[in-house]
Amino acid sequence: MMVCKGEIWLVNLNPVKKDNEMGKIKPAVVYQSNELNHSDYPTKIILPLSTSLIDGAEPIRMRITKRDALEQDSDIIITQIRAIDNDRFIKKLAHLTHQELKKVKELFDEVTL
């Protein structure tokens, strides 16, 4: 399975260990470099999406509109970054635009620097 940075995939985030961790089967943005994505590395870094929208929540969240197989407008949860095993990827839904991916990086930098 070929997974690329900026793609939105349906992933299995169960089980979770804490109440404040996102679980379920849900969409997520691949945020790992393609150098690692296209290697034999066993995990990928993702940012989960939520359809429970919160207006004005930047830099914690970034809104994206529905597209392709992503059926609802969603918020990318910037602060819920995590690595998941490659076996947790179910199917590709869509991808971010170059501008959206750039904005994700800006928001990620804002909450981590």
Predicted ranges, named:
Residues 19-25, 29-66:
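Compact nucleic-acid interaction/catalytic patches
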Residues 1, 66-113:
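C-terminal terminal-subdomain/extension
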Residues 14-18:
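Short, charged beta-turn/beta-strand-edge "cap" motif at the junction between a beta-strand
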